[in-house]
Amino acid sequence: MIQYTSTGKKSYTQCVFLEKEGADYRVSKSFGEMLKNEEFYKSLEEIVEFGISRYKENYSRRYQDTDLVLYQKYTYEDACRLLKWEHNEVPLNIGGYKYDKKTKTFPVFINYDKQEDISDTTKYEDHFTSYNRLIAISKSGRSIESEDVQNFLKAKERGIDVQLFVRKNKDDKISKEFYYLGRMMPTGMAKEFVMPNTNKTAVEIEWALDTPVREDIYKYIVNG
């Protein structure tokens, strides 16, 4: 059974539209009474129609065999759900990337612009070198032989699906979501190094994106 929890769930705990009835559900008594109001019913109908229209326009053209749409924006929770993970993961547990053994999916989440006041062990110099090439850094304290790094480098032979999500800045006031940029595979270029001002090692990996980043999004992310 897939289970998800979020702050959004807490916000809407008082909005009960359905109630459990045996093995099925029925419209809640309070919501049923509201539906008798013609003005409310019409407004609700318009909202539902708008939602369906927006879905068809923005989310119906799925990327390859995924439930994701290229260049649309997703939260961590959205990504976990659409990649069919059994449980949602909080951002702290993901920490830039996380491998799900059951689905063999390995989403990578990149904050392109790093804050100046973060610790040296989290100042990863992830950067695009072209529209379809990315240099990404592993978590600190990793070597070439680390399991997560090996899963990246041997993704093809292990059947691991690496997916890329990028946002310009984690404190972006406009959106807390990541642009979905599709699948990527390692080019074979990887090197271990010691992170500046620390004694921690990390691994730099070059990636080839399956689909080059759309020009307007690329310029928005890369340009300061």
Where are the model-predicted features located?
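Catalytic cores and motor modules of nucleic-acid processing enzymes
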Residues: 1-92, 98-101
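Short linear sequence elements within intrinsically disordered, low-complexity coil regions
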Residues: 9, 17, 22, 30, ...
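Short, structured coil/loop segments at alpha-helix boundaries
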Residues: 5, 9, 24, 28, ...
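Compositionally biased, low-complexity repeat tracts
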Residues: 4, 28, 137, 178, ...
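Residue-identity detector for glycine
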Residues: 8, 22, 32, 51, ...
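Acidic, glycine-rich low-complexity segments with interspersed aromatic residues
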Residues: 68-177
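Compact mixed alphabeta submodule
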Residues: 171-224
